[in-house]
Amino acid sequence: MAKKLARIAKMVAAESKNEPAADFVNQFTKFIETSQKPYTPSQYYKPSGVGGCLRKMYFERIGQSLQDNASYNLIAMGEAGTMRHEALQEYMVNFSKKDPNFEWLKVDEYLDEHPVEGTNVDTNFVKNDFETKCKNELLQLSFLCDGLVRWQGKVYIMEIKTETMFKFNKHTEPYEEHKMQATCYGMCIGVDDVIFLYENRDNFEKIAYVYHITDDMKEQVLHKLQECEKYVELGISPKVYCNSSYCPYCRKEGRKL
């Protein structure tokens, strides 16, 4: 009994000694979470959401999107993903200077030479030196394109994805929602072939898949957009709920919207 009490006393003393450090972590974490810039949502559809929740698409389209307060770990995951995207894009730009089979193309210049009806480049938006902001007014789509490349004589949309080891090891082709996302890009840029570059964010292993956008995939995207637009015109939120426990539009408290 005496030994057990002595052990407990040591644990309490250790916790007390470390209290300033623990307090620092707590306060610093709160600062990270509360110092994020306010999110101003666009009323355009996002290609990354077209393969997902219809209710989310609807509320974003009418300008009433919900923004959950992001936890510090989700904030860090987003920041890490952005940094890896930019690092890989910079490597690709430099790779294009060394390998004659690879060319990094400028999206705005490509669209000048191969215009797509309804698609415009937002020249006022600058996130970094690699990504291009595009909008298509006919489809009401707005997005940042990771890159456009010519590899071995063929033009591809370059789509970069970072993911956990669990997801990385699970799939043998692009996920369906990623195919839908890339199809949106293809419809807006006029390119029907995609290279998906997946990177394991735990050990940075990479794998790539070539994906060809079919007419059937374009019809699926068009149908999803048209379905959502019908609800927008009626002013009625779709009562079609996704299975995600994280979706604020489909959780119990969000279903009354």
PLM feature spans:
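Short, glycine/acidic-rich beta->alpha junctions
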Residues: L139-Q140, P174-K179
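Metal-dependent nuclease catalytic regions and adjoining charged, substrate-binding loops involved
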Residues: S16, K170-Y175, C188-L257
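Metal-dependent nuclease catalytic cores that hydrolyze phosphodiester bonds in DNA/RNA
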Residues: M1-I157
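A structural signal for short, well-ordered beta-strand segments and their strand-loop junctions
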Residues: G49, Y156-E159, D193-Y198
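Short beta-strand-loop-alpha-helix junction that forms the active-site gateway
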Residues: I160-E173
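Short, structured patches in soluble enzyme cores that scaffold and shape functional sites
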Residues: V149, E159-T162, Y198-N200, Y211
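Short small-residue beta-strand/loop micro-motif enriched in glycine and branched aliphatics
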Residues: D68-A70, F166-N169, K206
